[in-house]
Design a protein with these regions (language model features):
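Internal alpha/beta loop-helix hairpins
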Residues: 2-69
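A conserved hydrophobic position in a structured secondary element of the catalytic/binding core
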Residues: 21, 30, 86, 135, ...
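Short coil/loop residues immediately preceding or within conserved phosphate-binding loops
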Residues: 53, 104, 118
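Short, surface-exposed charged micro-motifs
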Residues: 55-57, 111, 122, 152
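Short, conserved beta-turn/loop elements at beta-strand boundaries and strand-helix junctions
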Residues: 63, 112-118
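OB-fold (S1/OB) nucleic-acid-binding surfaces
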Residues: 64-69, 123-131
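Glycine/charge-rich catalytic "coupling/switch" loops of P-loop NTPases
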Residues: 67-113, 138-175
């Protein structure tokens, strides 16, 4: 049975194999977890909601962004330009400094948008990185997280997806 949908809830609950087709081409085919957590390219990542995408230089266990901010990775990589991604639900927010020192940043909440059961929270870190988190409303209340307030954000090295190839984002032009 083939079912076509843009509803990610349906994909995750009903689909055991997922295909992402964009521009008339099969971009990725696999189980839902792999497609959502390890997208094949930027197009698939953006389509499945991986909003935190960063172009960087990877070397060893570090990803270095152009603004000097670095992320700790879950493996070791040879020096190369890459794209990395972090899903919004993997970003943890806290009004108090967490114990973790890996991928820990301090920043200001610039927007809160309701997405049903969760809120999309956009933050700008002191280092100049824009991070999007997906947070349950109860966590917003208990963490005292509001627009204009500052808070801590963190994510584990395991939550960072390092894309196999670096493909620069290009504009699609009609001919």
């Amino acid at each position: 049975i083939v079912m076509v949908t843009h509803d990610f809830g349906e994909v995750l609950s009903l689909g055991n194999r997922v295909a992402v087709i964009s521009g008339g081409k099969l971009q990725q085919w696999g189980n839902a977890r792999t497609v959502f957590r390890e997208p094949a390219n930027r197009n698939v990542a953006e389509f499945v909601g991986m909003k935190n995408l960063f172009e960087c230089e990877v070397q060893g266990e570090t990803a270095l962004l152009s603004n000097g901010v670095s992320f700790l990775l879950r493996g070791s990589y040879s020096p190369e330009r890459r794209l990395i991604g972090i899903r919004p639900e993997d970003v943890v927010l806290s009004s108090t400094r967490p114990q973790s020192l890996a991928n820990l940043f301090y920043g200001r909440v610039v927007s809160l948008v309701s997405r049903g059961m969760a809120f999309e929270v956009v933050l700008h870190s002191k280092g100049g990185v824009r991070i999007t988190a997906s947070v349950l409303s109860s966590a917003l209340v208990s963490g005292n997280i509001r627009v204009g307030e500052e808070c801590w954000m963190s994510f584990s090295p395991e939550s960072i997806h390092v894309f196999r190839q670096y493909i620069q984002k290009t504009e699609v032009q009609a001919i």
